[in-house]
């Protein structure tokens, strides 16, 4: 019998959990993080489920595994893990992992104040501000983000005909604005979103295909972003992002904020240099900015940046014991 040990640091970014795996993960094959992610999914997805699912995790758990970079221009590599799979990119996960890796001395940037990260979605640059030994804030320059499709429609059980735009900010998002079928965040409950979101994602996923123009390994609709009027006086918009099977992001969501900024830029609401303050379902804020315009294939895109904060909550040495019948974790679902 074998017991696998993983050395983790737990924390949260603006309210959403982050579990950083600092030791115990396997070496991965591949020339880049896309290939290494594929190897991990083929051979080691039990690590993701074991660390993210109950009884060691929970429905909202997400995290990242630290690896040496595959690119000469990067300081470190992140492999993102969460209940829904291995995401190409995770904004809140990057902010949290950067904060904890720096505060614990697990990475030394070549340029003080800047950490360059190798991810399956590409190079992500993180600029951070320190206060003594602590990281006050992290601003990440995300991958090029773009509006993929507008005005898509699908019949969703319990809602009827729903219209949505789909945008990419590191993951594909169905962005649902207030309409006849959805009155807006301020008029629904979190339990409504948990009930509707899987149905909406399935309905749109069956009817349409979503494939990154330059990286076909990134495909499929993984997230649903519900919108509403802001409550915080500094915010431009409020959102609740659904991911996995039963998770609503407690943070404003980094890749979701990037996708929303791409949508607004395509609509002419944002330009280079424009700020965009995004409010989460619990009232925390990410501060976005359009850094540049770009092209992804034939699609117009933006290069967004997002600033947020994170805090470490503790160390966690986790065992996955082969004797444990629940070693790979479990999720409680309605059809159980």
Name these PLM-found stretches.
Residues 1-165, 174-336:
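A glycine-rich beta-to-alpha transition motif near the start of alpha/beta enzyme domains, typified by
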Residues 170:
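Glycine-rich ThDP/TPP pyrophosphate-binding loop and its adjacent helix/strand module
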């Amino acid at each position: 019998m074998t017991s696998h040990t993983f050395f983790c640091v737990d924390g949260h970014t603006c309210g959403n959990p982050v579990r950083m795996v600092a030791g115990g993960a396997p070496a991965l094959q591949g020339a880049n993080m896309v290939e290494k992610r594929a190897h991990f999914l083929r051979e080691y997805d039990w690590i993701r489920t074991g660390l993210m699912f109950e009884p060691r995790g929970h429905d909202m758990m997400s995290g990242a595994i630290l690896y040496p970079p595959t690119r000469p221009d990067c300081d470190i590599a992140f492999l993102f893990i969460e209940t829904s799979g291995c995401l190409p990119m995770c904004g809140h996960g990057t902010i949290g992992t950067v904060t904890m890796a720096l505060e614990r001395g697990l990475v030394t940037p070549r340029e003080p104040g800047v950490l360059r990260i190798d991810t399956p979605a590409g190079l992500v640059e993180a600029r951070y501000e320190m206060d003594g030994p602590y990281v006050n804030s992290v601003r990440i320059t995300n991958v090029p983000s773009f509006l993929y499709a507008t005005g898509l429609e699908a019949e969703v059980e319990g809602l009827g005909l729903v219209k949505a735009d789909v945008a990419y900010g590191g993951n594909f998002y169905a962005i649902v604005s207030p309409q006849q079928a959805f009155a807006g965040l301020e008029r629904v409950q979190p339990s409504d979103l948990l009930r509707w979101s899987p149905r909406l994602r399935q309905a749109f996923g069956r009817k349409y295909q979503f494939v990154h123009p330059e990286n076909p390994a990134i495909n499929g609709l993984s997230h649903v972003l519900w919108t509403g009027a802001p409550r915080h006086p500094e915010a431009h918009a409020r959102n609740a992002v659904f991911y996995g099977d039963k998770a609503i992001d407690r943070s404003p969501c980094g890749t979701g904020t990037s996708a929303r900024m791409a949508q607004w830029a395509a609509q002419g609401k944002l330009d280079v240099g424009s700020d965009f303050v995004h409010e989460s379902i619990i009232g925390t804020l990410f501060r976005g900015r359009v850094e540049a315009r770009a092209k992804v294939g034939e699609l117009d895109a933006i290069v967004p940046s997002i600033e947020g904060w994170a805090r470490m909550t503790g160390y966690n040495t986790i065992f996955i014991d082969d004797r444990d019948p629940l070693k790979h974790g479990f999720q409680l679902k309605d059809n159980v």
